[in-house]
Design a protein with these regions (language model features):
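Short, acidic, small-residue-rich periplasmic hinge/interaction motif at the N-terminus
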Residues: 45, 51-52, 89, 95-150, ...
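Short, acidic Ser/Thr/Gly-rich low-complexity loop/linker segments typical of extracellular
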Residues: 139, 150-163, 594
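Periplasmic N-terminal accessory/gating domains of Gram-negative outer-membrane beta-barrel systems
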Residues: 181-183, 195, 212-317, 327, ...
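Surface-exposed extracellular loop regions of Gram-negative outer-membrane beta-barrel proteins
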Residues: 461-462, 508-519, 561-575, 603-651, ...
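Outer membrane beta-barrel strand-and-loop segments of large Gram-negative receptors
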Residues: 481-487, 526, 534-536, 639-645, ...
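Signature of Gram-negative outer-membrane beta-barrel scaffolds
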Residues: 504-606, 735-738
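Gram-negative outer-membrane beta-barrel transporters
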Residues: 671-673, 692-781
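C-terminal beta-signal and adjacent terminal beta-strands/loops
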Residues: 675, 762, 771-788, 805-807, ...
Length: 874
């Protein structure tokens, strides 16, 4: 019985059980033999479900009340068995197609006086449950459950744990369940009370799965007020070409409108005018502070371990906070609770292995996933001792387990550990990495109230080592969080669903510690540690006002408290320190309190067209400080101080959505303002000049643009075209005469074309082409000499442009011979297929033949790069 426990007791039950199945549906034609002693009604029903094609639908409280049942029948019609089973019990049964509906007889109610019948509140019941994969037992996130009765249609989507709840009037309903990568399923029910209906969906694909962008094309997505959201999950559309055969989720989302790549060799990205640090990246609710490997060439996310990714560009739900621009919410696989299995891949620079299986079938499961590069193994082949003793690799390990504690409780434990190591023997080295751990407890109070409680740990640190003679030192930096979260989802009635919750985070930031060797010409220094509490409470309601109008509104209230121990400063606009105040351990330095209201609106013009609008305010209390134009593992996170204030953004978005089956068209426009934006003084050195506030300047920003997406989801040819037209500016006191200037991430045009074609059952071809306007950069305006040394001087911040960027990637996947429990494939790809020499950086020097002239030197990272990888699953 799909809404109850699977019968573990059947393994030891002292009963005999036999049946003769029939394809015919009438209960008279299905005959069973059944012998049970002192069993509960739930156990009897589950035994009948095991040996017949029928499923029972009933209120949980009705079933659990019936116990101590004994029954002994041999080769009797099911209809006769049902009559015998329920004779003398206060339960009625009704056959509805392949379902047997159980209910208590209706109680006689006294006549209603006072209000006429037309004004009385109609009786409502709740249909609730979970949606899971039939093959693995994992929850299905974002599945759509549509209940239809005559001309009335009501829908809902499962939450991030696969739970759903629908409030409906009594009656007969057709329930249609759909999800990406799953077969559509229909159930027929007769609703006469609160009913639990757990659903198992069959996967559409049995071979290897890839990541691709997918969105629902049904009416549910049109009716939802949520804007600027994209969901990625395992699906039937095959792979996008990748660099060196390594699948990269963060690179994939950068092919969507409004999400801009930070460039080659950089896993950072910009969303609607925000900086790379303004994106909240979560792995099972834990923040990942540096989502990159190998200096940004690859992301920290091993696709074998990832189940679902949701990206919010605007109108972020109130449970998310702490960043201005976007949320990337990554959920790990839960592990197969039915069978053991493994998958993995072997590429040119890395290999992966993923193992999963049940700890106790149907109740608990585990997942272990690992990945490592082996570029350092090739370095050992060199005859140069400096090279063959060098190290260059990264590794990561994902682990997860979940336990079903009961009908209403489930516990999840998950963790991630990743590390990068780059070193040149006897010269220098750097290593960095993330560690996260999450413990989550799901509890179902009742059919309408769902709870998730989480305890989360996150740590990021780096260490730089220099072994140069006379200048030996180590630099260590760290940011560490402990976070407690609680979220309640209350499905109040057919028109309202409410989310309320809180989170409390303790931040510890160790900006840097420099330790010298015995003979080094450098003093040991420890920058002051910073401590803070970041708390928030929130409440939102999604209201289905009419069949055409939906509204989500709410507020998040954030409080950021700066704690001692440490010194805090008064600083003049010139950067000079005017005074110093010392605070003891735990002493409150300052508290920033910020309300963050939000509202989103959807109006469905017809069955295929909708208009949406949203407004959201976000606050950011942690800031990334960097001296380089590209992301670096040595970039430093700093928290608010008495000088560094919370960044605040206000964003308004308007969108048009059209289902042009088999195409989908989305057009969104936005305008965003940002306060307390950070830039740097000319000649700033963020590593040695302390306090850091003396190196910073503050101001405001604005961004606006138009995003266009046309996507085809079905057929042999699938893909999308995205285009973004945008402008991003900053106005910082002390820069460019206090006038508006281009932010580094300002790009006028950004285009991506993605296509996948299933040539045959075995071959799949794919390609993507990207183009974007070059970044705004600062180039020298002149030069001068001092004692024979050449120095460049700069007059206008971000007054020039890098060359325009464009690139074509192509790929092909060959599905190899499949066996019953084993599948494999070969993936071939070419990155930058026509060898475009895109600029990574441009430096300047005197021309060798004419010192009066200055020449620009362009550095290119990638030209044409072919790759091959082998992937398997069993």
């Amino acid at each position: 019985m799909h809404k109850y426990f699977v019968l573990p007791f059947l393994l030891t039950l002292a009963s005999s059980l036999h049946s003769t199945r029939s394809r015919a549906q009438p209960t008279e034609e299905v005959r069973i033999s059944l012998k049970l002693d002192h069993a509960s009604l739930k156990q009897v029903i589950q035994a009948i479900e095991v040996v017949t094609p029928f499923k029972f639908v009933a209120r949980t409280e009705d079933i659990e009340a019936e116990k101590n049942i004994s029954i002994n029948v041999t080769d009797r019609p099911l209809s006769e068995v049902l009559q015998l089973l329920f004779k003398g019990r206060n339960i009625e049964y009704k056959l509805f197609k392949t379902n047997i509906i159980l209910k208590r007889p209706a109680e006689k109610k006294p006549a209603s006086y006072g209000l006429p019948a037309s004004l009385r509140t109609p009786e409502k019941y709740t249909l609730s449950g979970s949606v899971r994969s039939q093959r693995t037992g994992e929850s299905v996130i974002g599945a759509t459950i549509m209940a239809s009765s005559g001309d009335q249609h009501t829908g809902v989507t499962t939450n991030e744990y696969g739970f759903y709840s629908l409030t409906l009037s009594p009656g007969d309903y057709t329930i249609v369940i759909t999800a990406v990568g799953m077969h559509r399923k229909e159930e027929e029910i007769s609703l006469s009370g609160n009913t639990a209906l757990n659903i198992a969906l069959q996967e559409e694909i049995k071979d290897l799965q890839e990541f691709t962008v997918k969105a629902s094309s049904n009416g549910r997505s049109l009716r939802s007020p949520q804007m600027g959201m994209e969901r990625l999950s395992a699906s039937e559309i095959k792979d996008i070409p990748v660099l060196l055969g390594e699948r990269d989720i963060l690179k994939t989302i950068q092919l969507l409108p409004g999400i801009k790549s930070a460039g080659d060799g950089n896993s950072g990205f910009y969303v609607r005018g925000g900086g790379a640090d303004q994106n909240l990246i979560l792995l099972d609710e834990a923040p990942v502070y540096n989502p990159s490997h190998l200096l940004g060439f690859f992301s920290t996310f091993n696709s074998d371990a990832v189940k679902n990714i949701v990206v919010y560009k605007s109108g972020m739900p109130a449970q998310y906070g702490g960043r201005l621009s976007s949320v990337v919410d990554v959920k790990m696989n839960e592990g197969n609770n039915q069978d053991f299995g493994a998958s993995g891949g072997i590429g040119l620079i890395s290999s992966r292995l993923n193992i999963e299986g049940p700890l106790q079938k149907d109740k608990s499961s585990f997942l272990l996933s690992g990945r490592r590069t082996y570029a350092d193994l090739f370095l050992k082949l060199s005859s140069d001792t400096t090279i063959n003793r060098s190290r260059l690799y990264f590794y990561d390990l994902n682990g997860k387990a979940n336990y079903k504690l009961g009908e209403k409780d489930r516990l999840y434990l998950s963790g991630y550990f990743g590390r990068d190591v780059l070193s040149q023997e006897s010269v220098a080295g750097i290593n960095w990495g993330n560690t996260t751990a999450t413990m989550r407890w799901n509890h179902l109070f009742n059919s309408r109230l769902f709870s998730n409680t989480s305890l989360i740990y996150s740590n990021y640190d780096f260490k730089i080592t220099s072994k140069t003679a006379g200048n030996e030192f180590n630099i260590i930096s760290q940011i560490k969080d402990w976070n407690l979260k609680e979220e309640l989802q209350w499905y109040a009635d057919a028109k309202n669903s409410v989310n309320i919750g809180f989170n409390a985070i303790h931040h510890t930031i160790k900006p840097g510690e420099i330790t010298e060797a015995k003979d080094a010409n450098l003093n040991s220094t420890t920058f002051q540690h910073r401590y803070s509490l970041e708390n928030a409470i929130y409440a939102t309601n999604t209201w289905k006002a009419t069949d055409r109008i939906s509204l989500t509104y709410g507020i998040r209230l954030s409080a950021f408290t700066i704690l001692g121990k440490g010194d805090y400063y008064g600083i003049e606009p010139s950067g000079k320190i005017t005074d110093t105040t010392h605070y003891g351990p735990g002493q409150v330095v300052k508290t920033y309190l910020n309300p963050e209201p939000r509202v989103a609106f959807a109006y469905q013009l017809n069955a295929t067209t909708a208009l949406k609008a949203s407004y959201v305010r976000n606050t950011q209390n942690l800031h990334l400080i960097s001296n380089s134009v590209s992301s670096s593992p040595t970039d430093r996170w700093v928290a608010n101080t008495n000088i560094i204030k919370p960044e605040i953004s206000d964003q308004v978005s308007i969108g048009y959505y059209k289902d042009l089956a088999p195409f989908e068209l989305t057009v969104e426009t936005y305008y965003k303002t940002m306060e307390h934006q950070i830039d740097y003084r000319n000649g700033a050195n963020i590593y040695t000049n302390q306090p850091i506030e003396t190196q910073l300047l503050f101001g405001k920003g604005r961004a606006y643009g138009l995003e266009w997406l046309l996507r085809k989801r079905t057929g042999r040819f699938t893909g999308w075209i995205s285009y973004t037209l945008s402008k991003t500016e900053r106005k910082i006191d002390g820069i460019n005469d206090n006038q508006w200037y281009n932010a580094r991430q300002d790009r006028t045009h950004d285009i991506a074309v993605v296509g996948t074609y299933k040539l045959s059952r075995k071959w799949t071809l794919s390609a993507d082409w990207v183009f974007y306007t070059g970044d705004a950069v600062t180039f020298p305006s002149g030069k001068y000499k001092v004692d024979g040394d050449v120095y460049f001087y700069y007059t206008k911040r971000n007054g020039y442009r890098m060359p325009n960027y464009h690139r074509l990637d192509i790929g092909a996947t060959l599905l190899l011979k499949q066996k019953k429990k084993f599948s494999s494939e070969m993936n071939f790809s070419i990155y930058n297929a026509y060898g475009r020499e895109n600029a990574y950086q441009i430096s300047f020097r005197e021309a060798k033949n004419d010192p009066s002239r200055t020449e620009a030197v362009q550095t290119t990272l990638f030209r044409l790069i072919p790759s091959i990888s082998y992937n398997f699953k069993f």
